[in-house]
């Protein structure tokens, strides 16, 4: 599958120039950075995805340093690696994929300290990855994040397009899609240890499953942000849903003796069948 990687450092420099000249950061960001690629990025999407646009960055000093480093990024090598990933997990069509690299806000301490300076967003085929080259080792995580987001593309193509209507929009779907995506990326890059999967002890995850997640997996009315990304006020740790989903998938893989690619077409609730005791998660 053809994968095209676009580095936006030139557009970012245009944005910086306009902001320094006194123009509105929000307007310039939209005109110089986002709108240049947004229509193409969303060309496969079945509905409007405007809420997923990358947010404006106003720290111009940091952005200038990021641009200098982004310009040095080898996008050709990245594209080859991304194509290797797509060959391991073929999609259900041959549509080419575009990956746009935007900078991430240097002021986002969560991304910098817990996500290695790299986050991705899937847009029903194409995707974008936000990177902070000021974070040490960020380059290694671009490929992991691509693998994770690309798995979303394939999973979504199967369940939301080819088999539309066969899922019941239960919370188990959310746990499984990210659990499988991280399982896929971890198999490709086993030396990388994402904090969002391993920041909690196994006892903590077991407790979360027993007291919280096992009670809501079949619900269609779940606060997604709280239970996937965490909520300190409700005692849900950061990214707890990712950690729980990953263990759920890993448990099923061990019991079924299948691999992570083979279970992509397995309905999410089936992954629960083996969880007859909390010990197994």
Where do the model's predicted regions map?
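N-terminal low-structure segments adjacent to metalloprotease catalytic domains
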Residues: 1-73
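Hydrophobic, aromatic-lined core segments that form the binding pocket/scaffold
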Residues: 121-123, 130, 154
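Auxiliary, metal-adjacent structural segments of Zn-dependent hydrolase domains
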Residues: 62-124
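Inter-helical turn/loop segments and adjacent helix faces that build the functional surface
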Residues: 136-137, 160-169, 190-199, 255-262
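Post-HExxH zinc-binding segment in Zn-dependent metallohydrolases
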Residues: 2-4, 8-11, 166-208, 279-281
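Short pre-active-site segment immediately N-terminal to the catalytic Zn-binding motif
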Residues: 131-146
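Active-site recognition of the HExxH zinc-binding catalytic motif
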Residues: 144-157, 178, 182
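Pan-zinc metallopeptidase signature
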Residues: 214-281
């Amino acid at each position: 599958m053809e994968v095209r990687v676009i580095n936006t450092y030139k557009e970012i420099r245009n944005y910086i120039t306009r902001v320094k000249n006194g123009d509105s950061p929000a307007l310039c960001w939209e005109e110089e950075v986002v709108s240049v690629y947004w229509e193409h990025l969303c060309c496969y999407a079945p509905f409007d995805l405007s809420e997923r646009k990358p947010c404006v960055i106003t720290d111009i000093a940091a952005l200038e340093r990021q641009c200098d480093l982004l310009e040095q990024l080898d996008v050709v090598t990245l594209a080859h690696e991304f194509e290797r990933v797509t060959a391991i997990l073929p999609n259900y069509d041959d549509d080419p994929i575009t990956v746009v690299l935007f900078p991430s806000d240097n002021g986002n301490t969560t991304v910098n300290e817990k996500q290695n300076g790299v986050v991705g967003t899937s847009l029903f085929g194409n995707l974008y990855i936000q990177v902070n080259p000021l974070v040490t080792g960020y380059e290694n995580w671009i490929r992991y994040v691509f693998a994770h987001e690309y798995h979303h593309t394939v999973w979504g193509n199967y369940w939301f397009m080819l088999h539309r209507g066969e899922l019941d929009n239960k919370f188990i779907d959310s746990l499984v899609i990210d659990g499988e995506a991280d399982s896929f990326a971890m198999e490709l890059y086993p030396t990388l240890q994402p904090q969002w999967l391993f920041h909690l002890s196994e006892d903590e995850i077991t407790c979360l499953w027993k007291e919280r997640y096992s009670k809501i997996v079949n619900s269609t009315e779940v606060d997604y942000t709280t239970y996937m990304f965490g909520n300190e006020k409700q005692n849900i740790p950061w990214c707890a849903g990712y950690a729980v989903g990953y263990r759920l998938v890993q448990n099923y893989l061990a019991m079924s003796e299948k691999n992570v690619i083979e279970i992509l077409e397995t309905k999410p609730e089936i992954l629960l069948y083996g969880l007859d005791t909390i010990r197994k998660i």
